[in-house]
Amino acid sequence: MYMPRLRARQHEVFAVRNCASSFAASSRVTPILEPVAAPNDLFTRRLGAIAEEGASCDLVLNPSVGDLRSKGSWRELGDYYLENDLLEHHGLAVLSNADADHAAMSRWISEARGAGHQFTLDIVHELDLSVTLQGATYHGVRWNIAEDRTVPASYGLPLGGLLVVWANDPFPSLPRNREYVGREEGIFSTRVAGYKSAGYLGVSDFLTLGRGYQPGGGPAYAVVIHFTYESGDVVRLKHFCSESNETQDDPAGKFFEALEKLIDFVDERSLPTNLGIDGFRDLYQRQHFPGLGKVKELSIMNHMLVMQDAII
């Protein structure tokens, strides 16, 4: 099982939608979507399109970043999920951190289920030692997602006895794109082959984005395409960077400098293709710059599909 964590921004949801049929066919990927802004009809339609392909996501009830971080926002978000029938096809995820009102959220979940809404429930245990959670607070939990399975175990039964998805964030987030120039490729994950022997159900990560959250970005001196690929029993990470990084001018030119390196690398290694790589190759052949949001979308797609294939 692979559970990528995304902030549910436009291109992130697009990436999931584009891969939905592949996820449905493999039954190995369940994305966790954490809205950072109030959902709207477009968000609902995209989730509907994902469900129509046979795929399912976890929708976070209590986001930890963005416009919905305030403690009272979770109830309005949860009601939106119910009113728009999103939990008929998708599951619910609760983030366990110091801001989580577990007592109130567990009551809301019980009331929703009592009213006839049937949905799966997963608990994502954040790295926050101030959390106090009783193992019997939530009922009908499916999985724990945690960086260490001893964390949910410490809360007692029945929560502590459930299967755990092994979470981490191996992506090397740097303040500026230029800092990736000259950075050597490295191992992104060894867990794809070892999670079962370590006693876990699956793995979870923040893809080629990292845990950190920034509400927006501006012009950059360098364009970087973050690219993962499977090599033996590990998933490796490489950063393809532009060359003309002295000014912020010509982002399209910078993109093609980085893209040419990526295409050459894929061809030299004879890497298996996927929807993300196909998207990059199409842009290269047409010499089309779609904007950096689309570049991020294709990077995410490639990573999710690489992880899907790497999970044993």
Question: Which residues fall in each region the model found?
Answer:
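Conserved, mostly hydrophobic/aromatic
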Residues: 16, 31
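Terminal catalytic/cofactor-binding subdomain
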Residues: 2-3, 26-27, 41, 51
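A short acidic, amphipathic alpha-helical/loop segment
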Residues: 18-20, 42-49, 104-108, 131-133
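A broadly used, surface-exposed interaction patch
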Residues: 49-114
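Hydrophobic, glycine-enriched assembly/anchoring segments
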Residues: 260, 267-312
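Leu/Val/Ala/Ile-rich N-terminal alpha-helices, chiefly Sec-type signal peptides and the beginnings
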Residues: 19-24, 28
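Long, charge-rich C-terminal accessory regions
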Residues: 131-274
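Catalytic beta/alpha-barrel core
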Residues: 4-8, 32-35, 56-63, 89-100, ...
